[in-house]
Amino acid sequence: MNPMGRKWANIVAKKTAKDGANSKIYAKFGVEIYVAAKQGEPDPESNSALKFVLERAKQAQVPKHVIDKAIDKAKGNTDETFVEGRYEGFGPNGSMIIVDTLTSNVNRTAANVRTAFGKNGGNMGASGSVSYMFDKKGVIVFAGEDADAIFEQLLEADVDVEDVEAEDGTITVYTEPTDLHKALEALRANGQEEFQVTELEMIPQTEVTLEGEDLETFKGLIDALEADDDVQKVYHNVADM
C-alpha cells in the first residue's frame, strides 16, 4: 500500500481549499492549457493531452473564461514557447521536494527556485538526488465505497492497476502512469462521471513527520515554491500536509 493511501482524500481537500482561494492556480492552468492546445489540436476530443488538462482544470474550478482565453491564444499566431523543467531539493530533517515547472524563461525559473530553497531553510540538490525516492503513479479519486468492484472493473478493462483503496466514502485508484487515461475511460464506461482528482503524481516511498519549527520552516518553503508563477506542481514526502 502506498504511504499516501488512506489520507489522500484529506490531502486533496486541503489542497483544493488552498488552490481555490488562489488565483495563481488559474494562471498556471492557463499556461498548461495553452501548451497542450498548441502542441496538438485545440480540440479536446482529438487531443488527449488537452482533454486531460481540462479535466484537471474542472476539478480545480478554473473559470471558463480562463480556459477559453488559453485555447484562443493557442489558435492564434503567437510563437511563445514554454519548456518543462524539474528541480529537486531538501528541506529540514529529511524532507524531500520535487518541483515541476513550465516556463518561457528557464534561467529566470532556475534562479527563482534556487532562491526559494535558499531563503526558506532548504537546499537544491542535483538531478536525481530526490526523485529516486518517489514513484510516478496515476491517481484517481472519486466518491464510492466498493474498492473490490472497482478493482474488478479495471482488471476487466485490462488496466495496469496497482491498488484501489476505499475510506470514508472515497475511492482512490493507483495505476501505472501510462494507464491513467485507460483507467478513466474504463470507469466512465461503468457509469462513473465525476472525479475529485485525476493526476499523474510523484508518490513518496516513505514519509517523514515534521514538528514545531521544522514544520513551520517546511510550510514556508512549500508556500514560496508554489507562489512562483512558473511552478506547476510541488511534491514532497512530509506526512499530513
UniProtKB/Swiss-Prot annotation:
A cellular component term, taken from the record's GO annotations: cytosol
GO MF annotation list: DNA binding
GO biological-process terms attached to the record: regulation of DNA-templated transcription
Broad class of the protein's primary localization: cytoplasm
SUPFAM superfamilies recorded: YebC-like (SSF75625)
Family classification: Belongs to the TACO1 family. YeeN subfamily.
Name under which the protein is recorded: Probable transcriptional regulatory protein stu0195
Species annotation: Streptococcus thermophilus (strain ATCC BAA-250 / LMG 18311)
Lineage: Bacteria, Bacillati, Bacillota, Bacilli, Lactobacillales
